[in-house]
Regions:
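Double-stranded beta-helix
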Residues: 1, 79-110
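A short, N-terminal "cap"/entry segment at the start of jelly-roll beta-barrel domains
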Residues: 1-24, 30-36, 104-110
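Short histidine-centered beta-strand/loop micro-motifs
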Residues: 26, 34-40, 47, 81-83
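A generic "binding-loop/recognition-motif" signal
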Residues: 32, 41-42, 60, 76-77, ...
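Short hydrophobic/aromatic-rich beta-strand segments that constitute the beta-sheet cores
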Residues: 35, 55-57, 92
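Glycine- and acidic-residue-biased ligand/ion/polar-headgroup-sensing regions
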Residues: 41-59
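Short acidic-glycine-tyrosine-enriched beta hairpin
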Residues: 58-77
Length: 110
């Protein structure tokens, strides 16, 4: 459990030097946000499966609703916020050399 909600890993593969893939389902509680962050070794692809999210990528905010998606290249700053009164659920597909929780740089900690 995180301060913004929770996630669960649905699928994970890739070993050694090959590209990795991880699929997660994230639930973001009403009024909560993921931190502004970027990843060195992985790209992410988000699909909204429930609710409406505000997604900021490289300083550009936009609203995404159910079945809408966005691709986030490695190294790009991004953030997801739930400004509604209902949970937001997304499927996150990670691909890259590392799909680990440690591959994260948070803007607030700089």
């Amino acid at each position: 459990i995180r301060n913004w909600g929770y996630y669960r890993v649905l699928h994970e593969d890739g070993t050694g030097a090959e590209r990795k893939t991880k699929v997660k389902e994230l639930t973001v509680d009403p009024g909560k946000s993921l931190s502004l962050q970027r990843h060195e070794y992985r790209s992410e692809y988000w699909v909204i499966t429930q609710g409406v999210a505000t997604v900021e990528i490289e300083g550009q905010p936009r609203e995404l609703g159910i079945h809408e998606n966005v691709e986030i290249p490695s190294g790009w700053w991004h953030k997801l916020s739930n400004e509604t009164s209902s949970p937001v659920r997304i499927v996150e597909i990670q691909t890259g050399l590392k799909c680990e929780e440690e591959d994260i740089e948070r803007a607030e900690l700089k």
